[in-house]
Amino acid sequence: MTNIRKTHPLMKIINHSFIDLPTPSNISSWWNFGSLLGLCLMIQIVTGLFLAMHYTSDTTTAFSSVAHICRDVNYGWLIRYMHANGASMFFICLFLHVGRGVYYGSYTFMETWNIGVILLFAMMATAFMGYVLPWGQMSFWGATVITNLLSAIPYIGTSLVEWIWGGFXVDKATLTRFFAFHFILPFIITALVIIHLLFLHETGSNNPTGLNSDADKIPFHPYYTVKDLLGALVLILFLMTLVLFFPDLLGDPDNYTPANPLNTPPHIKPEWYFLFAYAILRSIPNKLGGVLALILSILVLAFLPLLHTSKQRSLMFRPITQTLYWMLVANLLILTWVGGQPVEHPFTTIGQLASISYFSIILILMPISGMIEDKLLKWSL
């Protein structure tokens, strides 16, 4: 009798995706982050669902309902902090996953990569709206500042902002719709993830060498299921350490003060995972220019396949571009640090220099170094 997993219509899909999937034999731990992102998404949906059962999306009771979850609901504090810190773990895995894709040239899988960029935007939107829900000071002012950026759009800007707000200020209507969107987006993300995997399985996985691995494939199960399980255990260890010992490490103390439209916090800043983009936004003195730079800082990923000049796919054997890549990583860390600093000298200058070098490395230096390496290997035509 044939195994049910190979005949049953539903089991067959699962079998071809997670069990009998032919996988390159040499993929390293950098390939673990896809499954870890899936785990993060599941944790976020489950904890978010339980939080939604007790949360009220009304300006008068939102802050109190979060306090109620932490104080009165059974293990509410655990669910709340798992959700808040789970978002941080999600973005850590996300940045490492994207970084791996850039390093090993995975962006040459155009469809998979573009869905990935859309996923990144969807996750950033979800995280931003989730940050508004506790209705603390930073929630309110973060929502005000970021939504206000849309007013930079010529002609329709002001109307667009008021339409998103549902009034003339961030108020009850804004909070209610943000809660609705924050609830629905993770399910849209889940659908996009399935499409992401569908496109990936059309081509098969990339590997560290960037070479064709058809000659050396192994089944996904048990080799990579066990490897992913180890990664999952490490992720849960990190997450629970954060939740149980340092729950407020990555949060903002201002968010423990209820939202007050009459009192602006001295330093408005987003969550740590948006600081690099926030620094790029702030480094341009023009409002519209800043907004465009902010969008482009993420959208630039979509242009990577067009900027690939080398005849080699991966950076494994390309020392010049490798150096530029790690300069880019250092640059992003500097931008993250600057984004959390006040708008004053020398931080503004550092932010501007880091923003210029960020775009220069990606758009100019990396394509040039790819051509130089081809020339050095006498590979150029």
Curated annotation (Swiss-Prot):
Major localisation: mitochondrion
Keywords: Electron transport, Heme, Iron, Membrane, Metal-binding, Mitochondrion, Mitochondrion inner membrane, Respiratory chain, Transmembrane, Transmembrane helix, Transport, Ubiquinone
Subcellular location: Mitochondrion inner membrane
Ranges annotated as spanning the membrane: 33-53, 77-98, 113-133, 178-198, 226-246, 288-308, 320-340, 347-367
PROSITE patterns xref list: CYTB_CTER, CYTB_NTER
Cofactor comment text: Binds 2 heme b groups non-covalently.
Function, in words: Component of the ubiquinol-cytochrome c reductase complex (complex III or cytochrome b-c1 complex) that is part of the mitochondrial respiratory chain. The b-c1 complex mediates electron transfer from ubiquinol to cytochrome c. Contributes to the generation of a proton gradient across the mitochondrial membrane that is then used for ATP synthesis.
Additional facts recorded: Heme 1 (or BL or b562) is low-potential and absorbs at about 562 nm, and heme 2 (or BH or b566) is high-potential and absorbs at about 566 nm.
Protein family membership: Belongs to the cytochrome b family.
UniProt-recorded name of the protein: Cytochrome b
Source organism (scientific name): Apomys gracilirostris
Gene: MT-CYB
